[in-house]
Amino acid sequence: MDRIIGLPDEVLVKILSFVPTKVAVSTSILSKRWEFLWMWLTKLKFGSKRYSESEFKRLQCFLDRNLPLHRAPVIESFRLVLSDSHFKPEDIRMWVVVAVSRYIRELKIYSSHYGEKQNILPSSLYTCKSLVILKLDGGVLLDVPRMVCLPSLKTLELKGVRYFKQGSLQRLLCNCPVLEDLFVLLLRCDDIGMFIVIVPSLQRLSLYLSPRCNLEGFVIVLDTPLEYFKLVDRNYDRHPYMIENMPKLTSAYVEVISADLKSLVESITSVKYLTIFSENYDDFVFPWNQPSTVPKCFCPVYKSSPVYKSSPGQNT
């Protein structure tokens, strides 16, 4: 212990960065010197899916009192895991405001509360110049203001979030000029309208549609030079796909139930590696005679295409 105490503060903070935030905070009782060392940590994670109500109340008091006093000039990562409905939206907004004021690089929020739409994201988040990674999971409302610009955002992950109105997602995407990786899971019956992705910088897109979504009038429009595309559509409502401008597409995974599989695949002809899974191949049947050799002129960019079909009494 004496050897550790003799180390410089910078080294002690580095050591604390390798342990959970809760453990790092607990070292503040060791001595006067250790009291505020954890406040120099650049990666913070608070909350747990297994917290009791009393634990969440203690966490709320702790964050209200200590987070505004955090000393690190830059917060590399700030993560909140909130699996309780007792948090007030204004409290969460204040915590995010503090993180944004510290030039945050990564923000991840998980909320398991699926009650009424409550906005827990401050408007300052949508103009954060330093934010590179944004991940929202669960009962988080995406209410995009008119003033939005995320010039550094490269990774955006939206799992089961709620959308304030039609066009919220499109407005956000249009103001992310360097976005490279987009993951969207539509989980509940939000009135999202058209899913439009026109992002020239986007390289990877993963889209999941839950069978619980009400997708009446839903249209998917993709116009972006992707390199990787994954579509998992388990919804039984038929909805059109408008896909174009994917000349750089290298790999694609398509898993659909009721979509027009043939037209969908025909719209991604430049792909090199294609994986298809569907319960319905009725509109995707074509005659095939196995040739002894593959002509050189036959689809020069094509390399492989696993096709999976499940039927009763037959292995895939």
From Swiss-Prot:
Residues 1-47 form the F-box domain. Gene3D superfamilies: Ribonuclease Inhibitor (3.80.10.10). InterPro entries: F-box-like_dom_sf, F-box_AtFBL13-like, F-box_dom, FBL13/AtMIF1-like, LRR_dom_sf, LRR_FXL15/At3g58940/PEG3-like. It holds the Pfam family F-box. Disulfide bonds: none annotated. The lineage of its organism: Eukaryota, Viridiplantae, Streptophyta, Embryophyta, Tracheophyta. It comes from the Eukaryota. Signal peptide: none annotated. This is F-box protein At4g09920. It comes from Arabidopsis thaliana.
